[in-house]
């Protein structure tokens, strides 16, 4: 690699590449979430018959992973570059390897391995066949072919490619700590994110109000159900995301027992499943607008039989 791309140049390069492959460039969704998969641009769009090709950066918060900014590779918040293609292209792995070349990583000159790692997200009732992508011994990407999302079988199958941007940038820039990554010319990652890393870690582990969080979870759960009763999928899913983040804060604080933990996850999963079913039903009412006319006519005729 001759030129060491900055963090933002890595993002720009991936955006341009996947735009050229036919992906819409979405923006980060404005609710806390633990992974790019939980964005409605993946979770909702992976279900139902309509095609969907999108790419976006997603800041992902995992309160239990915070380390006060003292760990060089473990973060309260990291950034994922998410690519979702439905139906999955037959050459998705080749497309991915070509994206690495755009970043200056020649697959012929490096040890790139696809290590089987089937994926599951119990809190959203989602699972799929998956692989971790290892670059010279370091995981940089997760590949998943969704089989189930929100408890619904996916058809057509959606392919998801999730780049870990901090890990990728650490490799490209040859630094040992994420805080030494050059975000932009003359600006280090740590100069932007070290302070919030420390503060969010302190809040998550020491300061959060457990009673308030428990109360909020109950309120968010009820509001999600209330929105679903009116067929309001997106407001309901926003509250599912709020439930998930609130649970993650409670978990980081040690406020839930092992038994309670399973119960909270089941409550979030049940809501997510209703959201998924309602989303498909509402898209059907709209006539699945992203389908081509011929496919739409056939599908709606079959459903009407």
Swiss-Prot record:
GO molecular function, one term: glycine-tRNA ligase activity
Subcellular location: Cytoplasm
Reactions mediated catalytically: tRNA(Gly) + glycine + ATP = glycyl-tRNA(Gly) + AMP + diphosphate
Disulphide-bridged cysteine pairs: none
Entry GO terms, CC: cytosol
Source organism superkingdom: Bacteria
Keyword Protein biosynthesis annotated: yes
Keywords: Aminoacyl-tRNA synthetase, ATP-binding, Cytoplasm, Ligase, Nucleotide-binding, Protein biosynthesis
EC number: 6.1.1.14
GO biological process: glycyl-tRNA aminoacylation
Stored InterPro entries: aa-tRNA-synth_II/BPL/LPL, Gly-tRNA-synth_heterodimer, Gly-tRNA_ligase_asu
Enzyme class: ligase
Keyword Nucleotide-binding in annotation: yes
Pfam families tied to this protein: tRNA-synt_2e
Family: Belongs to the class-II aminoacyl-tRNA synthetase family.
HAMAP family registered for this protein in UniProt: Gly_tRNA_synth_alpha
Subunit structure: Tetramer of two alpha and two beta subunits.
Protein's name according to its UniProt entry: Glycine--tRNA ligase alpha subunit
Gene it is expressed from: glyQ
């Amino acid at each position: 690699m001759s030129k060491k791309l900055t963090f933002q140049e890595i993002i720009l390069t991936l955006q341009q590449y996947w735009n050229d492959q036919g992906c819409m460039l979405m923006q980060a969704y404005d609710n806390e979430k633990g992974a790019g998969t939980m964005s409605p641009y993946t979770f909702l769009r992976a279900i139902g018959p309509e095609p969907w090709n999108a790419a976006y950066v997603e800041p992902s918060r995992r309160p239990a992973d915070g380390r006060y900014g003292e760990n060089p590779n473990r973060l309260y918040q990291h950034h994922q570059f998410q690519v979702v293609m439905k139906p999955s292209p037959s050459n998705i792995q080749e497309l991915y390897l070509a994206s690495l070349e755009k970043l200056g990583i020649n697959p012929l000159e490096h040890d790139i391995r696809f290590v089987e790692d089937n994926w599951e997200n119990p809190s959203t009732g989602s699972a799929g066949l998956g692989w971790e992508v290892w670059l010279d011994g370091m995981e940089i990407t997760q590949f998943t072919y969704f089989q189930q999302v929100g408890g619904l079988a996916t058809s057509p199958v959606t392919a998801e490619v999730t780049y870990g941007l901090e890990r990728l940038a650490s490799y490209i820039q040859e630094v040992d700590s994420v805080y030494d990554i050059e975000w932009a010319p003359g600006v280090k990652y740590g100069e932007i994110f070290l302070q919030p890393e420390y503060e969010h870690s302190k809040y998550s582990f020491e300061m959060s109000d457990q009673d308030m969080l428990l109360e909020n979870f109950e309120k968010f759960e009820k509001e999600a159900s209330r929105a679903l009763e009116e067929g309001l999928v997106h407001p309901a899913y926003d509250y599912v995301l709020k439930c998930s983040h609130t649970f993650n804060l409670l978990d980081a604080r040690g406020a839930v027992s092992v038994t309670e933990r399973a119960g909270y996850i089941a409550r979030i999963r049940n809501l997510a499943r209703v959201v998924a079913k309602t989303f498909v039903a509402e898209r059907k009412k709209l006539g699945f607008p992203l389908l081509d006319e011929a496919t739409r006519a056939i599908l709606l005729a079959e459903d009407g039989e």
